[in-house]
Amino acid sequence: MSRAIRNIAIIAHVDHGKTTLVDKLLQQAGTFAAHQHLAERVMDSNDLERERGITILAKNCAVTYEGTHINIVDTPGHADFGGEVERVLSMVDSVLLLVDAVEGPMPQTRFVTRKALALGLKPIVVVNKIDRPGARPDWVINHTFDLFDKLGATDEQLDFPVIFASALYGYAMLDLKDKSENMRPLFDAILRHVPVRGGDPNGPLQMQISSLDYSSFVGRIGIGRISRGRIKPGQDVMVLNGDKPPKRARVNQVLGFKGLERVQLEVAEAGDIVLINGVEEVGIGVTIADVNQPEAMPHLSVDEPTLTMNFQVNTSPFAGQEGKYVTSRQLRERLDRELMSNVALRVEETGDTDVFLVSGRGELHLTILLENMRREGYELAVGKPRVVIKEIDGVKCEPIEMLTVDVEQENQGAVMQALGERRAELQDMQSDSRGRVRLDYRIPARGLIGFQSDFMTMTRGTGLKSNVFDEYAPIKGDGTNARRNGVLISGEQGDAVAYALWKLQERGRMFVSPGERLYEGMIIGIHSRDNDLVVNPIKGKQLTNVRASGTDEAVVLTPPIQLTLESAIEFIDDDELVEITPKSIRIRKRFLLEHERKRASREPAAA
């Protein structure tokens, strides 16, 4: 009855080709029937993941190779989704560490690798994209070895097997001199090097939930690895959740993975990764145990949120015109639904029923949620992100991030100066022989808010940056990153007029185009000075009977700055909001009327 099982996770930095590699493994193991059309990057299942080329949620799939069932778990490479990573690693016996043949190991690989090594997992290193011009596999392997050594790897972990691969063209090899047409060397390495760590299938059941899914049809679904015993549909189990009293429950369905499909199983046993539903109390770290001999497993920790934002009902004059879901009840229901599967998220009530305090792992984590809500037809406003301050032993502490930037040498000075102003501390600096420099910093998380757009401007789009949470440390100085420029605020409601925008161009750069609908208090551009300025963008040219309309000057407009969700959230100040609807992203002042803003600015001064 017992089948040979291997459980493996894939670790990689964003865009190092992890999801493409899984595509090829699925294809070559014969998972897709000949008549099935295979989309590219099958593991990135939602639109946002495909557009951005990043994996947000850990996903599972399985292949069968030479009679062995291999469960493959895709992990998010981005540190904002690190909450997912740790739990995934608890289900597997080894990891495939995928590194780019040009870039080498990057900080997010470092983040997950540190966790994998600490758990005692022995990695298999896959040097991917060896078909790229400029590939330098030997340099990459040396850097990977140094990284493992820095992260405290054991001698056994440092003696790692290396596979060279091109996921795009679907081949792998043990030596660069070898010829290869397929992924067979990688499959063989998995069978040879991944330990079989199955428990006793005849013992009392023990299974820990490491990941959650939600289906409107069957409710919450728990995903986890069976450590001991067997589980089958209709079985009575005990749910053990930390200090809470044990609860009896009945499993409705047991599903396994076959390719990308979920298939119903008659029975599953120790060593397999399965999904179960029908158990209401299922949650991260919960142990599903035998009714007669319930034994809890050590509880899994989840990364704490480091960034918080206010999500609130849209109160602008255009509220409810573009969105389908606009009330606080609908917002609350959507956030509650997100909490079912998005474990690193926290939602708290505030004194105001229309405002929710949402905390997450970083800017990307929260903007992905906002972008998903926007696409589903939600309309809301959000405030400026703030870091989560903790009190440790009576000292106020803030989150510190490890930041790595890879820039061209001519941009190095500007980037270092900007990071110095944001209270970053340089840890390491390496230059390669190709005119690029890699800088490692420790930086307070609040120093990173708004840094992405500045960084892209300074490096003219050629810079690479990535950051990962390191620890909480005592707050140093105020170090607030105040915006240098003021803003241009519309003083009227109506449609923007080309003539007015043309006249306003000398005052700053615009966010709006002629014909766009505006309202009083909406921010329409960046002022060239450091103060805010109320302007009239809907004022047309005054015509008299002497000056005919035909003798007009040529109106030449500079193209406006295109606002994206991330750039708008990075841009705003404490007294501003981003209005998010399915069709538009607007920036506005919290108080729309000028006299209200003046009164609000006087209140703190009076206090």
Functional labels for PLM-detected ranges:
Residues 206-309, 319-321, 485, 492-544, ...:
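Conserved nucleotide-binding/hydrolysis modules and their immediate coupling elements
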Residues 1-99, 103, 143, 212-215:
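P-loop NTPase switch module centered on the Walker A-proximal segment
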Residues 38-40, 151-163, 197-208, 243-257, ...:
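Interdomain boundary/hinge elements
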Residues 15, 21, 53, 72-74, ...:
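Residue-level signature of catalytic and energy-coupling elements of molecular machines
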Residues 316-340, 554, 558:
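A short, contiguous, amphipathic alpha-helix enriched in charged residues
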Residues 3-20, 79, 105-114, 120-122, ...:
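Conserved structured catalytic cores and adjacent interaction surfaces
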Residues 257, 262-265, 443, 453-458, ...:
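Long insertion/accessory domains within large nucleic-acid-processing enzymes
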Residues 122, 132-192:
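Canonical P-loop GTPase G-domain recognition
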